């Protein structure tokens, strides 16, 4: 990825003179041609029984001179290894519903971090919410100061799961063979 202003500068440096607005329009038209593919891929993700979501901040748009606004990509991953990156200007809870909708396959599971928007969405959509092990492990790690014995036991069990995952990766297992 290279911002349009840098692409424009490289073209100009190479003796190719085009306007920056034309370059922007060309990019927008190209993205428009890809929209049906994006929509089909997103529909496949929404139909997945298991899907994962996370939000990640980016700087986009000017908040004031010299300062950029924070916006968010919300990568969504489906069980057929599809990924889409919906964009929203904030981290508000309703963006989860806007991205995933409320119609789900029976037994659907949403895998995410501990952000409360995901748990609220799962409850509203009547699906199972599962946290990723890295975030779950962090809670037990922090609990060692309060409940050292129980936290250590939980961390040991999570470590065993990590060992199973390492074995799966080392053996390059896929699909049902992972089970």
What are these regions (language model features)?
Residues 1-179:
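Catalytic center-proximal scaffold of phosphoryl-transfer enzymes
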């Amino acid at each position: 990825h290279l911002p349009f202003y840098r692409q424009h500068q490289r073209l100009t440096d190479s003796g190719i003179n085009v306007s920056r607005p034309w370059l922007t329009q060309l990019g927008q038209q190209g993205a428009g041609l890809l929209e049906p593919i994006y929509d089909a891929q997103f529909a496949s993700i929404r139909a997945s029984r298991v899907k994962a979501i996370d939000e990640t901040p980016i700087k986009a748009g000017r908040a004031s001179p010299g300062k950029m606004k924070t916006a968010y990509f919300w990568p969504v991953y489906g069980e057929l290894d599809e990924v889409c990156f919906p964009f929203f200007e904030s981290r508000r809870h309703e963006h989860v519903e806007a991205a995933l909708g409320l119609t789900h396959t029976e037994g659907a599971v949403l895998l995410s971090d501990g952000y409360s928007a995901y748990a609220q969405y799962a409850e509203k959509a009547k699906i199972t919410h599962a946290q990723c092990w890295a975030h779950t492990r962090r809670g037990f790690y922090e609990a060692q100061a309060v409940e050292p014995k129980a936290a250590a036991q939980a961390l040991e069990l999570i470590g065993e799961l990590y060992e199973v995952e390492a074995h799966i990766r080392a053996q390059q297992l896929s699909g049902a063979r992972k089970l």
